[in-house]
Each structure stands twice: as structure tokens, then as C-alpha cells.
Regions:
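Long recognition/docking surfaces used for binding and targeting
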Residues: 34, 41-137
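Low-complexity, Lys/Gly-biased intrinsically disordered segments
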Residues: 248, 445-492, 590
Length: 638
């Protein structure tokens, strides 16, 4: 009979598909265990049994975790022996009630799918894949907890400038992915805090099985008051005691902290108001609630020793929202910014579409006008160890920056240097300062164009800007008049047969407020991947209404300096579209340009003949498109 030996195990199997198959089987066949937490717990117990089995067997020795050794009837007994050995070795982690509850038929199925796989070779990713496939976005998404994707963990560890003796804490460690990878990369002084008992147990158990000698993952809420901590927590997780914080804190509007006792511990637990004279933000009163990621910024600084560093993942809105400037002021006054890395909006898919940034701080008095590193990652790849080169380029540039005492010879979106005095309106978004766009503007300015600020044209009343309206869902489908939304603007024109249409009565209510005229330019101001799209209103397009995410630009008087066609051309140039892209801020999952269209520099030709030619060509194209559209509509009329 053929038995599996330790040497026969392979890492060539696709763990992702194996777990999907197991999940589907157990969900339909495992009696008495339907909750995802219980399914994951049973799978976790089997995974650690297999890991221990591989660790305990010699290369030429048969493994216990197989169906046929010595025969199928002893399978459950062998698995229980492995589990009891783990139970006895780690009685403070596993509880008395913990046991293998899976029935023999289901156990045989699971073992049949895993027996040839080498868990040791997959130790960096096995837990993450297990949770992704068994619980997916439901893991703790309702509590603001999302898996830290493997590429982002790679980035976090690549940004560490530490030695192996560095004392590291993750105060919201979840299943321990960040700490597990830190441990496997040679950082052995690792500590974790997790308020969810189930997740804390998983992280601790997996770490000790990987070789971590000490129980350093503790159940507890990092944000709770110090006096409410257990003696064990006070002994092991103290303030001013860590060299490095690595954390992906829970975030989201659905999980606010509203406990007054917790809030009053933090400066950021209070409301702040901007002093109109000094421009500084002043603390005024306790907030009713605060997002957890905000409080984690302050708590992590408290955990750090003087000179310690924090690498924290934050939603982009924290670093850009006008109402959150008091947070930026707090950061600037209580720490030194070392680096800010922008991650793509797809980084945490499929769990959340929230755009994030990585902020690296040092707990130290900030120097005067110091410099710091910025980098932009536009794309990453999941479920593969060979990540798209954006991450590698940013890591390499940051390491060069550190070795060169805070300087870079070459600047690119993958690495550039900013000073505190370079900041505008306390905006900490790397895209906003993209050096590629700044260089493009310098090159254009030296050519045959002058750069005119859009906002200056509005102030001079050369351009008038209005916005659309939200008419309410009850108005949809009440008539035949197009209600134009952001998705209805494409290819320089509008879709006059949109999904949403309204009645004559609704149109009459808004027609004078919106005042849509031929020659107006519609501009998408909000909406993921749509911002910057433009359409020129033709005489056939005027009987419409536009939603509030669309702006209407009108050149008040066509002149030799500017007319509607030249403005339309300028807005659609690559340099304008790049500027617009760099000024988009993402609040949670909503992209918006806000009033930053005013900051966009329009390229206006200096040569009258060049300007005239651009106007004529743009006009010709737009009129031809309008004529073709009209002709096609007539063709369809029977």
C-alpha cells in the first residue's frame, strides 16, 4: 500500500482552489456546524494539526495527516492525537472546550484534499487564504476589519528601517498576518493586541507553531482605558515601550467609538475648531463619537518609545478631508513625518474599495521645515509572490532616500522628497504633489503656451460655474426628459437616452435654476473613474436636467482670448486631465474633485494662429459629431 512520507509533500498545489472546494463541501455536508466562525475554527485546528505533523516527522517518515496510514479507520484517532499534543503544549492558548468536532466523513474529505500539500512551504499565506475563502468579506468587515493584502504586507515590511532586535507591536493584529510575516522575515521580538478573542487565539497559536517561543498576542482593546486593562496587559503592553508599530487599524463610519470614557483619553476624541485669526485648530468639547482609525493614530504614538516609529495604514480621507485638518495639525505637532505612500483604490479588493495611504511617523519633536519621502503606487497584484513593480520601486527609492540622508537624485512618482513648507492646505496626499505633473507644467510653460488658472477665470467672471441638482429617486421614470448623470457623459457628448428620465413638471421646476444652453460645457466633478469627462451642449441637448455631481461651465463672452471651444480643448488636454486626476480626493469610496478645479492650470496658446487653428479643429469635430448624432436619430425615425 502506498503511504505518504514527509518527503512526498509538495508546495505545487493551488491552496486557493483547494479551500474553495473544502468550503463548499463542508457548507453542504457538515452536520451541526453551519456558522462560518465554527467552520473556520475546525479548519484552523486541522491546519495546525497538519503543520505540527510536518514539523514532527523526519523526511523519510510517514505523516499522520493522511487517510491510509496505517488505514482509513484510524484517521480520526491520529488527528486527535496531534490535536491533544498541541492542546497539552499550549494550554493557555487552547481552551478546554476546543476539540475536533468534524464528523469522520467530512474529516476524510478535508484530509484527502490537504494530505499531499506541504503546509510549511505555504506558512506565510495559508491562514490568509483560509480566511479569505471561508469567510471572505464577512470576516470582520462589519467591524471595519479587513485582511491586509499580501502585497501591502510586503510593502510595510519593505519600509522598515530596523534590526532584528526591534520590539514590534501590532495593536490591532487580527489573525496576525503582519506579525507572522514579520516573524518569518527575522523579526522575533513581536507583540500583538486584538480585541476579538477568536482572532487573537488564531494569531497566537499559529505564531507559536511557527517557532515563536513566547505568548505575545493578547486579547484586549487597544483603545480602552488603561485602568480597565488586565494585569497581564499592563505588564506586557505598556506605553512608551515599543520601537516600532505596524498596524492596519479597523476603519469605517459604521463602527464609531462613542464611549465617553474612551474618547476623553484622547486629544483626537474632542471636537476642534479653527481659529480664524491664527489658523490653528483649538480643542473645544468632547465629541459624541470618533472613527477608530483616528484614535489609533494617537494611541500608537503613546505605545512608542521616544524616537520610535509607526507604520500605519489609513483611509485617504483622513489625510485630505477639510474637516479633518485638526488631525493633520495633531500629527505635525506631535511627531515627525518620515514618509507617506499612496496605495491604489483597488489595494483592498475584494473586501473594500476604500483608498488608503501608508503613513510613517517618528515619535520625536518635529524639526523646522524638515523633509520627508512620498511615493505613489498605482497598481498591485494579489495572490502572487511576484507583485507588480510599483511596490518594489517605491521600496527601493525609500531605502535609497534613507541611505542618502533624506535625499534622492532622481524624482519620480515612485519616490520624491517634500518639505513641510511645501504642503498646501495641510494636504498629505502624494498624488497632489506628483513631480511628473509638476515637470510637465514647467515644460509646457517654456513652450508656446501660457498657463492660466481656472479659478482666476472664474474670479474675472470670464467663466461661470454652476452645479446640477439631486431631484430624488421618486422623480425617476416620471417622463421622457433626460436626467443626465455622470455615467451619461462620454466621448465628448451626452447620452440623451439615459436610464433615468423625468417629467415635464420636474423639468419646469429646475430648468431656470440649471439654465442649460447650447455652448455650455458639462464637467464630471465627482464619481470614481469618471471625473474630468466633458461634453459640449448642442442645440439638441438643452432640454435636460443634470445631477449635482456635474458642473456646468459657461464662457460668458467668446473673445480672442477664450471661447467655449478653446476651453473645451484645454480641459481635455493630457496635462489638464493629469492635473485633475492629481487633485481628486477619495473620501471612503467616493471620489471628488471638490473646488480644486480652480487650481487647474489651462494651457492657452500664445500664438494667435495656433489658437485659431485649435479652435477651428475642435469646433469642426464637435459640430460633426453633433450632426452625425442628429442624422442617425433621423435615420431611426420611421
Amino acid at each position: 500500500m502506498f503511504y505518504l512520507y514527509r518527503k512526498d509533500l509538495s508546495d505545487c498545489y493551488e491552496v486557493d482552489s483547494i479551500f474553495i472546494e473544502i468550503r463548499n463541501y463542508l457548507a453542504g455536508n457538515l452536520a451541526g456546524t453551519t456558522k462560518d466562525d465554527l467552520l473556520v475554527e475546525q479548519m484552523l485546528f486541522l491546519i495546525i494539526c497538519k503543520l505540527k505533523d510536518e514539523q514532527d516527522r523526519e523526511f523519510e517518515e510517514p505523516v499522520y495527516f493522511q487517510r491510509l496510514y496505517p488505514n482509513n479507520s484510524t484517521l480520526k484517532q491520529r488527528i486527535n492525537i496531534l490535536f491533544q499534543e498541541i492542546h497539552q503544549k499550549y494550554p493557555t492558548i487552547l481552551e478546554a472546550k476546543d476539540e475536533i468536532k468534524i464528523d469522520e466523513k467530512s474529516l476524510e474529505f478535508v484530509v484527502s484534499k490537504l494530505e499531499k500539500l506541504s503546509i510549511i512551504s505555504k506558512k506565510e499565506t495559508i491562514l490568509r487564504v483560509l480566511f479569505e475563502r471561508f469567510m471572505g468579506s464577512k470576516l470582520r468587515g462589519d467591524k471595519g476589519q479587513f485582511f491586509t493584502p499580501a502585497p501591502i504586507i510586503k510593502l510595510l515590511l519593505g519600509l522598515i528601517d530596523s534590526n532584528n532586535n526591534t520590539k514590534i507591536l501590532d495593536p490591532a493584529c487580527g489573525t496576525g498576518d503582519i506579525l507572522i510575516n514579520a516573524f518569518l522575515n527575522g523579526y522575533y521580538s513581536i507583540w500583538g493586541l486584538e480585541k476579538d478573542r477568536f482572532l487573537a487565539k488564531i494569531a497566537q497559536l499559529y505564531l507559536v507553531l511557527l517557532g515563536s517561543n513566547n505568548k505575545r498576542i493578547f486579547e484586549g482593546n487597544a483603545l480602552s482605558t488603561y485602568h480597565s486593562w488586565s494585569d497581564q496587559l499592563k505588564t506586557n503592553i505598556g506605553f512608551n515601550s515599543f520601537d516600532l508599530i505596524l498596524v492596519n487599524p479597523p476603519f469605517g463610519a459604521k463602527i464609531p467609538i462613542n464611549d465617553k470614557e474612551i474618547l476623553q483619553q484622547f486629544q483626537l476624541g474632542f471636537k476642534w475648531q479653527k481659529d480664524p485669526d491664527t489658523g490653528d485648530w483649538q480643542k473645544i468639547a468632547l465629541r459624541e463619537f470618533q472613527a477608530p482609525q483616528i484614535l489609533f493614530i494617537e494611541r500608537c504614538l503613546e505605545f512608542l518609545k521616544s524616537g520610535g516609529k509607526m507604520v500605519i495604514i489609513l483611509p485617504e480621507g483622513v489625510l485630505s478631508n477639510p474637516s479633518d485638518k485638526y488631525i493633520i495639525q495633531f500629527i505635525l505637532k506631535s511627531s515627525t513625518i518620515l514618509a507617506i505612500i499612496s496605495c491604489p483604490q483597488t489595494a483592498f479588493l475584494p473586501y473594500t474599495f476604500v483608498k488608503t495611504n501608508i503613513l510613517i511617523l517618528e515619535k520625536s519633536p518635529p524639526p523646522v521645515n524638515y523633509s520627508f519621502f512620498m511615493g505613489i503606487i498605482e497598481s498591485i497584484k494579489h495572490y502572487n509572490n511576484e507583485y507588480i513593480s510599483d511596490i518594489t520601486k517605491v521600496i527601493n527609492n525609500y531605502q535609497i532616500y534613507l541611505k542618502n540622508d533624506g535625499t534622492l537624485t532622481d524624482s519620480s512618482k515612485f519616490g520624491f522628497v517634500l518639505t513641510i513648507n511645501d504642503l498646501k492646505n495641510l494636504i498629505l496626499i502624494p498624488e497632489y504633489y506628483n513631480p511628473v505633473i509638476i515637470n510637465q507644467l514647467k515644460e509646457i510653460n517654456q513652450k508656446k503656451f501660457e498657463l492660466i488658472r481656472f479659478g482666476d477665470l472664474v474670479k474675472a467672471k470670464i467663466i461661470k460655474v454652476n452645479r446640477g441638482h439631486e431631484i430624488g429617486v421618486k422623480s425617476y421614470g416620471t417622463g421622457d426628459i433626460p436626467f443626465i448623470r455622470t455615467s451619461d457623459i462620454f466621448n465628448w457628448e451626452i447620452n440623451l437616452n439615459p436610464i433615468k428620465k423625468v417629467s415635464e413638471e420636474i423639468w419646469n421646476k429646475y430648468k431656470y435654476k440649471q439654465d442649460i444652453q447650447a455652448g455650455d460645457i458639462l464637467f464630471v466633478n465627482d464619481g470614481t473613474f469618471l471625473i474630468g469627462r466633458c461634453a459640449l451642449i448642442t442645440p439638441c441637448d438643452t432640454k435636460i436636467l443634470i445631477q449635482s455631481h456635474i458642473r456646468k461651465f459657461r464662457v460668458m463672452i467668446d473673445s480672442e482670448f477664450l471661447n467655449k471651444y478653446l476651453l473645451f480643448w484645454a480641459l481635455n488636454t493630457e496635462i489638464c486631465q493629469n492635473q485633475i486626476k492629481s487633485k481628486i480626493f477619495i473620501q471612503a469610496t467616493i471620489s471628488t474633485l471638490g473646488n480644486r478645479i480652480d487650481e487647474v492650470l489651462l494651457p492657452i496658446p500664445k500664438d494667435p494662429d495656433v489658437k485659431k487653428n485649435l479652435i477651428e479643429q475642435t469646433k469642426k469635430i464637435l459640430l460633426k459629431k453633433a450632426q452625425l448624432k442628429s442624422d442617425f436619430a433621423k435615420l431611426l425615425t420611421i
